[in-house]
């Protein structure tokens, strides 16, 4: 039974992905509490859904150590402002959406003052810096996790966590429509395509564009009819990619797309991609993939010592087996990439059977994480909120 019909709900998002999650959560919460008031730090989608914002979310959207250091005084000032505002407003619940370096400290202060807190999107504590789980325990009443292995990790440490499924799994059809994807991209359906995703960060494009393009050149010799789709997130990445392409593969014809990664992976027979969210999206698009990743030698040396997981790509982590090849650092070379991709492009009966089996596994994993995450997240908030109000009555 709802004890408080017009709760004050605070949310802080720090980047575009968080704004999308926040808007979905607000709209789902309105079904439970039509008179709720939403305050915090919001992007355009959350504002449209009815959230009052203290300042522009863009101020928190900084990436990379150098950028964080440069903006640290402003970030600390904004964090202090959020904490002071929340302590004054005393919301019924505070929900930090991702942005753990900013939100966990806010959550810890608020929880200590008696405000219920939820952290939405688990930090990658299961992969590295596992000691952060102690801070998460101090800072939150509940963690909302996208993936089942994340909940299993928190269970080991007795930290309250609820698996809600992944919003991306809700957004992508179990059987993606290739004809529709080709029409959206203005592509000839009868052609064969390979999607090449070099990552969204400058450093990823710098390290991966060359081996990925050289692999494409090898494949073009083996499959002369093969065409290449290269979705890039913005004009900066497009310019960076074109500059590298002019040096390493000037004669190779590619379709450069601004955005549209999802449609490219649905239209393509296979994908070559950087590890990260793209691998999960590729799995949901049922795109057979090869995952490649390179970084600075020192970064790799550190990562090898810090990362605690058997796999780096989300499809393999979800399946707990090597479903798709992962080629890291020196193994991420054109010859290896082309060889593994060739297994997806070969047209004999054995390879076709392997591809169909892989797509079937992708579909099973899709079903596992397709749970209507917005509604699940809202229900979790309601449960924590009502435990709170019943405690007070």
Curated annotation (Swiss-Prot):
One example of a Gene Ontology biological process annotation: lipid A biosynthetic process
Listed GO MF terms: lipid-A-disaccharide synthase activity; phospholipid binding
Gene Ontology cellular component list: membrane
Pathway as given in its UniProt record: Bacterial outer membrane biogenesis; LPS lipid A biosynthesis
Sorted UniProt keywords: Glycosyltransferase, Lipid A biosynthesis, Lipid biosynthesis, Lipid metabolism, Transferase
Statement: the UniProt record of this protein carries the keyword Transferase: yes
Highest taxon listed in the record's lineage: Bacteria
EC category name: transferase
Catalytic activity, EC: 2.4.1.182
Catalytic activity entry: a lipid X + a UDP-2-N,3-O-bis[(3R)-3-hydroxyacyl]-alpha-D-glucosamine = a lipid A disaccharide + UDP + H(+)
Cited function: Condensation of UDP-2,3-diacylglucosamine and 2,3-diacylglucosamine-1-phosphate to form lipid A disaccharide, a precursor of lipid A, a phosphorylated glycolipid that anchors the lipopolysaccharide to the outer membrane of the cell.
Protein name in the entry: Lipid-A-disaccharide synthase
Organism: Actinobacillus pleuropneumoniae serotype 7 (strain AP76)
Phylogenetic classification of the source organism: Bacteria, Pseudomonadati, Pseudomonadota, Gammaproteobacteria, Pasteurellales
